[in-house]
Regions:
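NAD(P)-dependent dehydrogenase/reductase Rossmann-like domain
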Residues: 3-172
C-alpha cells in the first residue's frame, strides 16, 4: 500500500488494505507486498498456491510421525512445480511442522525464522521427474528416535492426497 496517502479517504483505503494483508498472513495466505517475504512472480504464485495447504498438512503430519526433534528436513519438489521457487512450499511445511510445537503464532512469513531459531535446517531439492504424478511434494528427516521418516503428497482433483509413507506407496 502507498504509505504517503494524502487524503482522509486514501488513508482509510491504505489502512484497510494493510489490515487485510495482515489478516491474510495470519490466516496463512501468502503475503502480497511484504518486505520480509519472498517476492514471487504471478506465474509462480498461481502454480504454488494450490500446493500450500498440502505442504502444511505434510508438515503437521511429519511433526507427529517423526516424534519431534527434527534437525534437518529435506523438501523435494518433483514434477511441474520443480521449475518454480519452492520457498513458499518450504514455509508452509515449516508452518505445519512448528504449528503445535511453538508458543508463537507460526505463519508463512516467520516460519523459516522460527525453524532456524530452533536449529532446524531445510535442504531443498527439485527434480523434473515425479514418477506417476504431475507434481510430488516429499519431506523427509530424522526424528527424535533416530529413524528416518518420509511422507509425500500431491493434489488429486485439487485436494491434498498422501501418496507415500516411508517406503510404502498409498492413496489417502
Amino acid at each position: 500500500p502507498h504509505l504517503g496517502a494524502s487524503t482522509a479517504e486514501a488513508q482509510v483505503a491504505v489502512a484497510e488494505e494493510a489490515s487485510q494483508q495482515v489478516l491474510d498472513i495470519l490466516d496463512g495466505r501468502p503475503a502480497r507486498y511484504a518486505v520480509n517475504a519472498p517476492l514471487l512472480t504471478p506465474e509462480t504464485a498461481r502454480a504454488i498456491a494450490p500446493y500450500l495447504p498440502l505442504a502444511e498438512i505434510l508438515g503437521r503430519f511429519f511433526a507427529q510421525y517423526s516424534r519431534g526433534g527434527v534437525r534437518t528436513l529435506t523438501l523435494e519438489v518433483a514434477g511441474e512445480l520443480a521449475t518454480h521457487d519452492a520457498t513458499p512450499l518450504q514455509a508452509a511445511v515449516l508452518r505445519g511442522l512448528l504449528h503445535d510445537a511453538s508458543n508463537e503464532r507460526v505463519n508463512l512469513v516467520n516460519a523459516a525464522t522460527l525453524a532456524k531459531s530452533r536449529g532446524i535446517t531445510v535442504v531443498e531439492r527439485r527434480t523434473p521427474d515425479a514418477g506417476a504424478f504431475s507434481t510430488l511434494v516429499t519431506i523427509s528427516g530424522t526424528g527424535a528416535d533416530g529413524a528416518v521418516r518420509t511422507v509425500a503428497g500431491t493434489l488429486a482433483n485439487g485436494e491434498p492426497r498422501f501418496v507415500r509413507l516411508d517406503d510404502y506407496w498409498l492413496d489417502v
